[in-house]
Amino acid sequence: MTASQKIGLAFRSAIDPYTFGIAFVVAGFSEAQDNGTGFGWGPEGYFKRSGAAYLDAFDGAMIGNGLLPALLHQDPRYFRLGHGTFRHRFLYAVATSFMCKHDNTGKWEPNYSNVGGNIIAGAISNLYYPSQTAGAGQTINNGLIVTFEGTFGGVLQEFWPDISRKLFRKDPTHGLDAQARAADAAAKLKKQQDQNQPQQNQNPK
């Protein structure tokens, strides 16, 4: 991907309805846990929190999925697994918040872009959050929240086709998942046959 493609992808992610929706959810949790200081209570406080949560996510997306990947030559895309056990796929989706592919080698490496971008977004949030909460604690807290949002998004990308097929009888992958599962099953069968072959050769005639 070129630098402009990465920034464009980050912008589309930042204005996706999912990003707005998760900001409203985060704002709801924030208001439920707050003591009434800072943003305050009620509709006004809730919408202030929603706006701040969205800015956190927007900054994290643009910096962690756009600017830093362009500078560090890291691929910000999520590469869906689509087959294997639930546990394996879930852990894979979570890990992609902290691991990514390098542009040139295609090998997995620490996702400095995403982690660094989320921390920077957390630091920027001190500019528009109430002064009572500003500081290192706020930076870390908001950085972790943005990281969790991205992790949840990765899990959703991984399992949404499964959910869609189950609930709506629609396959967003147009059969690619079925092909991947078939290939995975064939590989497991071949591995099992290869393991059994030496045992058969050792049996006396």
Language-model features, listed with the residues they occupy:
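N-terminal targeting leaders of membrane proteins
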Residues: 1-49, 88-107, 129, 145, ...
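Hydrophobic alpha-helical membrane-anchor/signal-helix detector
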Residues: 10-31, 51-70, 112-127, 140-157
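Membrane-helix boundary connector in multi-pass membrane proteins
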Residues: 126-136
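Alpha-helical membrane-embedding segments
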Residues: 73-84, 110-124, 172-183
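Internal alpha-helical transmembrane segments of multi-pass membrane proteins
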Residues: 77-90, 106-115, 135-143
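Mid-length scaffold segments of soluble, non-membrane domains
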Residues: 47-98
